[in-house]
């Protein structure tokens, strides 16, 4: 039993609507921006935003700002997560299968857009990094926390591979993963002759065996 639990009445009221049930169903699976939700459900932005506001207001959704975008998802802990977990068997049937198919298409487009973006900026990566990080040296930060010897190290989202040689100083084997072919080509050239392998993949589906 949850201690000091507040009344669940606002939660039940919020879910007494088909659109909000559909929103919770898809956002329990994936964190999405407003634009992505609009594209997946085929509804107007004002309508979606109103329902999102109600769900965030009662705590059944959380929002996270990233630049110009706001992303929504269900809570990762606490009473609200426990409540939605108890309803999970019914939430699974709270919307058409087409919603999940549309969300999968939206996520594919997100990955493709990310890949196009990083392919485009790959040649100018060093300049962009200096503009963002200034004199900060990520390699020195890695050296400060990395053990003296490790069997395997991985850089997920390795970009052009600037940290891969640093990892190879102390790791017997190093793997760099990125979704951009242009970035991986730069990483491969940078690490020629080192015990480093580069692989194309998404963070959600890493090209690495468990364990």
Regions found by a protein language model. Name each.
Residues 2-47, 68-78, 141:
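N-terminal helix-turn-helix DNA-binding core of bacterial DNA-binding proteins
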Residues 78-124:
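Amphipathic alpha-helical dimerization/coiled-coil segments
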Residues 122-132:
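Class I SAM-dependent methyltransferase Rossmann-like catalytic core
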Residues 132-151:
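Conserved alpha-helix/loop element of class I SAM-dependent methyltransferases that forms part
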Residues 154, 159-205:
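Class I SAM-dependent methyltransferase SAM/SAH-binding core
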